[in-house]
Amino acid sequence: MLNKSLLIRFVLTILIIVQVIIFDTQPVQAAVDSYVKRYLDAEIPVGIKLNKQGELKNFSAEDLSEGKQTFAKNCLNCHVGGANLVNPSVSLSLEKLKGATPPRDDLNNLVAFLRDPMIYDGSSYTLFCRQITENWMSQQEVENIAAFILRAAQKAPYWGVENVR
């Protein structure tokens, strides 16, 4: 009786170990947000303009989804759909990002803005946009937010539009 009980425990332990090895060692695929799938055309990594020279940096759908999620947690109160509730004439559209001083239509400049926000003409700091310090978010997190904003400005319908009718 004791040997049979011991054998059953041994077999169950082996089965659990095999199950853990099989299921826990397979790569975990990060969830891709449905908005990113539907509107940002990011099934394969997409090149986001890195600097004014036009160099590109690739971002996966997972990176953009993480950027969207972080944007939703921290920026959405003022920037629903790429709008700007504090200053409606300055949205997050690609046109408005290009028109800022300095332009914010590339990853490096938009990250610099998020780290040290200035008003649209660049003449002074803004108190309305939260400064994202390195203690708060990593460089990759801020780049994912910026990549999400830039890709949405390129691809998402009605992103940053002043009047949707």
UniProtKB/Swiss-Prot annotation:
Where in or outside the cell it occurs: the entry states:
Cellular thylakoid membrane
- Copy out the cofactor comment: Binds 1 heme c group covalently per subunit.
Q: Can you tell me which residues bind heme c?
A: C75, C78, H79, C129
What is the required cofactor set for this protein? heme c
Return the PROSITE patterns for the record. CYTC
Instruction: Name any GO cellular component annotation.
Output: plasma membrane-derived thylakoid membrane
Q: Respond yes or no to whether keyword Transport is given for this record.
A: yes
Per the record, the domain of life is Bacteria
Protein topology in the membrane:
Peripheral membrane protein
Give one Pfam hit by family name.
Answer: Cytochrom_C550
What keywords were assigned to this record? Electron transport, Heme, Iron, Membrane, Metal-binding, Photosynthesis, Photosystem II, Signal, Thylakoid, Transport
Q: Would you kindly state one Gene Ontology biological process term found in this protein's UniProt entry? A: respiratory electron transport chain
The residues the entry assigns to the signal sequence are 1-30
One GO molecular-function annotation for this sequence?
heme binding
What family is this protein classified in?
Answer: Belongs to the cytochrome c family. PsbV subfamily.
Outline what the protein does.
Possible low-potential cytochrome c.
- Protein name (record): Cytochrome c-550-like protein
